């Protein structure tokens, strides 16, 4: 059962949120990770890989600072590859392909073993602000949870839309609902929101195509 007052509340349980929660808790702060689905903490949304050009260096830096991403990647790896080997060493970038299901499972397992860290499944719909200072979050189930600091790691879920062909519908990821409420709340405090798009093209076997 979560408590009503924390040092840090992390909103969102993706890779950024999981790392933020682990870092906060390991530094001794009483931390709460709030996510809409506890079963998808640390889940790989698309390509089940960590690292790559530029990103591989970031994962190594996180690892050097005591983060979990590199450890989880190693424990769930099915392939390691150094990219750009045809170029100079400064251009080399490590990448690991992981078992998607095991990756999320291992992330959750490591977080559950982290001291000072609690979990709560709910949607954050707004911030609690008093005298221009963050005091906590409001949730979709009507709970007010108080904290000294709030870290937002919402990923693609804020008012998320999924487009399939000419159709579109709300969702932060296929099969998961989008996060609503917090965007308009942030806008009421003067933040400006925009929309970015990412796409996953279909994988088609060229040998299956018939040329007419």
Which role fits each region the language model picked out?
Residues 7, 135, 148:
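Conserved acidic residues
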């Amino acid at each position: 059962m979560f408590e009503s007052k924390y040092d840090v509340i992390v909103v969102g349980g993706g890779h950024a949120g999981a790392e933020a929660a682990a870092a906060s808790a390991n530094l001794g702060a009483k931390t709460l990770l709030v996510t809409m689905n506890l079963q998808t903490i640390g889940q790989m949304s698309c390509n089940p890989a960590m690292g790559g050009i530029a990103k591989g260096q970031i994962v190594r830096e996180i690892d050097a600072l005591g983060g979990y991403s590199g450890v989880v990647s190693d424990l769930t790896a099915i392939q390691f590859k150094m990219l750009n080997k045809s170029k100079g060493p400064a251009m080399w970038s490590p990448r690991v392909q992981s078992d998607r299901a095991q990756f999320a499972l291992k992330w959750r397992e490591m977080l559950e073993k982290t001291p000072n860290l609690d979990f709560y499944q709910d949607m954050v719909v707004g911030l609690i602000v008093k005298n221009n200072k963050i005091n906590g979050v409001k949730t979709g189930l009507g709970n007010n949870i108080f904290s000294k600091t709030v870290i937002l790691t919402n990923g693609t879920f804020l008012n998320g839309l999924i487009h399939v062909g000419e159709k579109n519908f709300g969702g932060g990821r296929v099969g998961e609902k989008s996060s609503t409420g917090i965007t308009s709340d942030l806008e009421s405090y003067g933040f400006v929101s925009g929309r970015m798009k990412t796409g996953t093209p279909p994988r088609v076997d060229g040998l299956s195509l018939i040329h007419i």
